[in-house]
């Protein structure tokens, strides 16, 4: 890449970043937090944060990358995607009606709410315990990270249930919403994330999600400022780099350490070059249509229920890894959201996918506002827990693609909804058995005397 080509890419990158960052800043000033703000920051991180890292790798370490015209296509496709997404998100198809009384779909009381978070926590802890009994601490047993996906590890499906510890702790926080509950959320979820990191053998997702939710709650409540958020972001990047070194068993120093930091940070937070690789091999891609979305559900079907279930699931990530990169190491490499759309239907699917994503984020914001307006604090805690708990799925959406997001959000919805139903059933059983007693609040003495 010549300096002239780099200068052109830099101008496009600066304009695109400024465009998205400006819209995000105005939205932040208006509402302080909603899921449009979160997705916009996540989109910036995924598709634009990596460009400076790539530039340093190219000019400092002479690392080979896709041709400049392909990198330009990747930057422009990301900017155009966000433009279509933003217009879709802001467009109202019907007039907004405020304060119209509607019959609630469901309601919650104190006992049902506490039962719900206990059930969610139980699902996570029992899954971790069973996985540990089968495999022990994989971080200290395995020699490479790819072995996690080998036949040496049993009960891999249980990992999908670990995450429900976070929405359980979110319910606990939203019932109190004070600084002590906020700090308790951080300590409990990060401790659980470190435990699963050691047991699973290097999975950092639970730690990243817990820390991100903690920061956004702090921003919403005004407990942390923007400069504190930036400092925490730098700390998070360094922390993720250290965990990655431990995961891959790397011992580096000097220039090698700087090089390793650059490419691991890029691959962890901003795999934008994967989109460029897909565009570079565009003519070799056999468009998969909507099949990757259907195939991604296969992993949730147990083999005893479907004996002939394919052992290899050809979703967009695996198609990119196996067919485009010809990589059969056992790891699935993230194609990114736009990359998954390219795999499914080429360039035509990019604006269509942007419209779908805009509607998805709009729905989450509607649910979040519903929780903000809800007078029943127990129901509000459940709604907010569901919305913030789905942050993991939004990260999957940006990094892994639309197919992975759809299967995971449906799975999350089913497990969360089942926990609610079980909590309501248990409450009905306890109430029928006479085990539920209403709390009686005694009036202060002076107030009682005034009524006599």
Swiss-Prot record:
Localization per record: Cell inner membrane
The protein's name: Probable ECA polymerase
Function: Probably involved in the polymerization of enterobacterial common antigen (ECA) trisaccharide repeat units.
A GO cellular-component term linked to this record: plasma membrane
S-S pairs: none
Keywords: Cell inner membrane, Cell membrane, Membrane, Transmembrane, Transmembrane helix
Residues forming coiled coils: none
Quaternary structure and partners: Probably part of a complex composed of WzxE, WzyE and WzzE.
Organism annotation: Salmonella typhimurium (strain LT2 / SGSC1412 / ATCC 700720)
Membership in a protein family: Belongs to the WzyE family.
Membrane topology, record value: Multi-pass membrane protein
Pathway the protein acts in: Bacterial outer membrane biogenesis; enterobacterial common antigen biosynthesis
GO BP terms, alphabetized: enterobacterial common antigen biosynthetic process
Top-level taxon in the UniProt lineage: Bacteria
């Amino acid at each position: 890449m010549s300096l002239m080509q780099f200068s052109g890419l830099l101008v496009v990158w600066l304009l695109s970043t400024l465009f998205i960052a400006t819209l995000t800043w105005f939205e932040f000033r208006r509402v302080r937090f909603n899921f449009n703000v979160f997705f916009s920051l996540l989109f910036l991180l995924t598709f634009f944060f990596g460009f400076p890292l790539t530039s340093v790798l190219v000019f400092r370490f002479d690392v080979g990358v896709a041709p400049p015209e392909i990198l330009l296509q990747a930057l422009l496709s990301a900017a155009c995607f966000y433009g279509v997404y933003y217009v879709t998100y802001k467009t109202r198809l019907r007039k907004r009606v405020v304060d119209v009384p509607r019959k609630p779909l469901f309601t919650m009381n104190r006992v049902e709410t506490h039962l719900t978070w206990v059930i969610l926590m139980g699902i996570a802890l029992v899954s971790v315990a069973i996985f540990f009994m089968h495999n022990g601490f994989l971080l200290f047993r395995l020699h490479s990270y790819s072995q996690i996906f080998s036949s040496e590890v049993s009960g891999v499906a249980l990992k999908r249930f670990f995450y429900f510890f976070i929405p359980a702790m979110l319910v606990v926080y939203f019932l109190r919403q004070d600084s002590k509950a906020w700090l308790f959320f951080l300590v409990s979820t990060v401790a659980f994330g470190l435990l699963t990191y050691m047991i699973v053998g290097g999975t950092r997702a639970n730690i990243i999600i817990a820390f991100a939710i903690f920061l956004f709650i702090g921003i919403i409540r005004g407990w942390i400022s923007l400069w504190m958020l930036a400092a925490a972001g730098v700390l998070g990047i360094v922390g993720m780099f250290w965990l990655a070194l431990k995961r891959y068993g790397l011992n580096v120093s000097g220039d090698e350490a700087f090089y390793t930091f650059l490419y691991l940070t890029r691959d962890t937070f901003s795999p934008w070059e994967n989109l460029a690789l897909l565009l570079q091999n565009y003519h070799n891609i056999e468009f998969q249509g909507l099949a990757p979305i259907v195939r991604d559900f296969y992993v949730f079907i147990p083999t005893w229920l479907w004996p002939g279930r394919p052992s290899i699931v050809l979703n967009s990530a695996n198609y990119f890894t196996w067919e485009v990169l010809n990589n059969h190491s056992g790891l699935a490499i993230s194609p990114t959201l736009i990359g998954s759309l390219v795999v499914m239907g080429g360039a035509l699917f990019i604006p269509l996918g942007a419209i779908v994503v805009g509607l998805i984020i709009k729905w989450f914001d509607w649910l979040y506002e519903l929780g903000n307006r809800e007078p029943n604090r127990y129901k509000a805690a459940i709604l907010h827990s569901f919305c913030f708990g789905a942050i993991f799925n939004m990260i999957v959406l940006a990094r892994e693609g639309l197919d992975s997001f759809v299967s995971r959000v449906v799975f999350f919805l089913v497990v969360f909804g089942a926990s609610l139903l079980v909590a309501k059933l248990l409450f009905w059983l306890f109430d029928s058995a006479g085990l539920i007693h209403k709390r009686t609040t005694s009036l202060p003495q002076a107030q009682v005397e005034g009524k006599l």
